[in-house]
Amino acid sequence: MNRKVLIISRGFRAGDAITTLNLFAKWPKDSLFCASMLGTEFASEFSAFYLLGNDEIKFSFPFSFLTHIDESVIVKGGHNATIDNAKRKSLKRSIYENMLLPVLQRLDLYETRYKMRLSDKLAAWINEISPDIIYTSVGDIPMANFILEVHRRFPEIKIAVHCFDDWLSPTYKIINESKHNNKAEILLNEILSIAAYRFTSSDKMASEYKERYGYTFRCFPNPVRLSANDNAVFKSTVPNVVFAGKIGWHNNLAIKDMISCIENLKNQGSDVRFDIYSDCTVEQIEYFLGEVPMSTVFHKPVPNKQILNILNSAHALFLPISITEHAEKFTRYSMSTKMGEYLSTGVPTIYCGPSTIAMTEFIKSRKCAIAVENPGPQYLESALRAVIENNSEISAMCSRGIELARSYFNMEIVSQDFANELNKEL
């Protein structure tokens, strides 16, 4: 019998949510619960979903002035009540994102902009559902403190920690970075000491975390749901590169390089286009990317069922990580949630990232994508020209990617292995 699992997440949405649901694909819905402060579109996937709200989340000024927090509720069906950031496209929010936010990050006030506490309402709900395991990826200092508080109240519930990235090192610059890292390190060490299960998403992370913290970590790749696509795929007459996902400090410079690459090719007479599918607000796009030329087209995010058709129809897919010191620290152990899905399409993938991180090492060793390890649009231009030429080497690369998706990233294989691990006797 499957144990009851409560997933506690900062934001259960987009690729992170899909990856987690794919990991729990073998789990019966009546044994799966979730508590999250953002995102309820996947609420129907759970027996019950607790939307963390103003009972558990307290923002400090000026964040309390800029962020509306809904009431804490048990969500049913897929009701879309969330912390309302994206809807507030006001002057004060624009000033905050473009002027105040960088200062707060620099002074290390961003990570602690809110605190979380275990409310009586949430404690009563946890008592009611009586989970055997709490599964969390932590992700920041407030969530780390929150997980520890929940454990102190419910010490009998086993903790499963899944480390997807090295969140102890933020992607933005901090004046006193060592102080921030030490604080986060102490919290993560405490969580790892009480955890019954310790997981990572890359072998590099499992190996180096064992050396760093002294615990054994089990690696589970980010699984992808493979589907037989019998429909004919129609490529657009205009060669295009597609990126689907978040835009932030970890990848904005790489995306800007691709934007410049496409615009340079356009100016040289090549008819090419860069299609970006993201849920970023206009303010966020301006903040992270600046002014964008017409050769780059932004699209609203599409349902997950449709994204595979978009990826299949592309001439090339783009997997970006900014080649900077701070992005390298944050992503050194990460594996993109999109990688398996990209590879499964058989469409050539252009990857950009620092040479020392897990994704770069994986892609180069498996020879499943074109790896660009230097910043600058000229390097992406060379990669894109190789894709357009589509020689036998590119075809072989794509075939290796498909095989990896069917074996290493296959949801049926990974999720069964994951279920066996969580259900075994400790």
Predicted regions span which residues?
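Active-site proximal beta-strand in glycosyltransferases
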Residues: 5, 133, 137, 149-170
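Conserved N-terminal ligand/cofactor-binding loop architecture of enzyme catalytic domains
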Residues: 33-112
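Conserved catalytic-core segment of nucleotide-activated headgroup transferases in glycan assembly
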Residues: 225-228, 234-290, 297-305
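Carbohydrate-associated surface elements
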Residues: 204, 222-223
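A charged, aromatic-enriched C-terminal amphipathic alpha-helix characteristic of glycosyltransferases
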Residues: 374-375, 379, 392-422
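Membrane-proximal helix-turn-helix segments that form the acceptor-binding/catalytic region
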Residues: 124, 142-145, 149, 153, ...
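Nucleotide-sugar-dependent
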Residues: 250-253, 305-307, 317-340, 349-361
